[in-house]
Amino acid sequence: QPNPNEFFGLM
């Protein structure tokens, strides 16, 4: 599962 940091990194 993708890490929260990865998700926010896209933003």
From Swiss-Prot:
Chief localisation class: secreted
Methionine amide: residues carrying this PTM: 11
Organism: Pseudophryne guentheri (Guenther's toadlet)
GO biological-process terms attached to the record: defense response; neuropeptide signaling pathway; tachykinin receptor signaling pathway
Protein name, per record: Substance P-like peptide 2
One Pfam family it belongs to: Tachykinin
Lineage, broadest ranks: Eukaryota, Metazoa, Chordata, Craniata, Vertebrata
Modification Pyrrolidone carboxylic acid occurs at: 1
PROSITE patterns: TACHYKININ (PS00267)
Record flagged with keyword Transmembrane: no
Cellular component aspect of the GO annotation: extracellular region
UniProtKB keywords: Amidation, Amphibian defense peptide, Neuropeptide, Pyrrolidone carboxylic acid, Secreted
Tissues expressed in: Expressed by the skin glands.
Physiological role: Tachykinins are active peptides which excite neurons, evoke behavioral responses, are potent vasodilators and secretagogues, and contract (directly or indirectly) many smooth muscles.
